[in-house]
């Protein structure tokens, strides 16, 4: 707050549309992606699903396991890695608990597809990190602020998710993700411009 005037920043155009009619002008600022997040020359696994997130019902681990079991009926060699959970009921499911950033990066660089079945997310940084690494994402249609090219599937619709995943595993979809607007240097520059505008506005 400056001189009793608020300067509101949100992470997506969707939240801007929701809030502006209630509180006035809102500025959109993207989450930044760490410069260490880069694609790798290592060949990706052919049948490897990945779910990254804390162990919370909103993140959809149980749903992800249900979907993976069904996908394995078509692709028996499928392997699945999940963070957040520390025990696994299946030999094909690697429950990794909490992991270091270096291991997360390795998973993003080698997995086949990232699952984001969450009930809710703001602007999920893990999606931006995955796309920056060249890893395609399938996400719940409840998540509104997703980059163009992300595969969407209906929330908690097992059959729809299985169909979309199997289709991708059969015929991977190429996508172009413009990473520059999510780089830290660019976001820092945008914050500088925003602060300058706020100060200049108050000086008028």
Question: Can you name each region flagged by the protein language model?
Answer:
Residues 170-203:
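A charged, aromatic-enriched C-terminal amphipathic alpha-helix characteristic of glycosyltransferases
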Residues 106-111:
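Short alpha-helical donor nucleotide-sugar binding micro-motif in glycosyltransferases
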Residues 1-38:
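Donor nucleotide-sugar binding/catalytic pocket of nucleotide-sugar-dependent glycosyltransferases
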């Amino acid at each position: 707050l400056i001189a009793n005037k608020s300067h509101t920043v949100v992470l997506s155009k969707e939240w801007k549309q929701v809030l502006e009619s209630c509180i006035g002008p809102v500025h959109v600022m993207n989450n930044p992606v760490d410069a260490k997040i880069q694609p790798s020359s290592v060949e990706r696994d052919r049948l490897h699903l990945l779910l990254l997130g804390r162990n919370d019902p909103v993140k959809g681990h149980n749903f992800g396991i249900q979907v993976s079991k069904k996908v394995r009926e078509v692709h028996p060699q499928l392997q699945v890695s999940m963070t957040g959970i520390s025990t696994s009921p299946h030999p094909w499911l690697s429950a990794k608990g909490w992991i270091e950033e270096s291991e997360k990066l390795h998973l993003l660089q080698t997995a086949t597809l990232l699952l984001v079945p969450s009930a809710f997310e703001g602007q999920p940084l893990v999606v931006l990190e995955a796309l920056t690494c060249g890893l395609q994402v399938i996400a719940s249609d409840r998540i509104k602020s997703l980059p163009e090219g992300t595969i969407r599937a209906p929330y908690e619709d097992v059959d729809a998710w299985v169909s979309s995943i199997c289709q991708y595993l059969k015929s991977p979809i190429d996508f172009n993700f413009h990473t520059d607007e999510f780089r830290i240097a660019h976001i820092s520059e945008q914050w500088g411009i925003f602060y300058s505008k706020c100060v200049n506005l108050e000086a008028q």
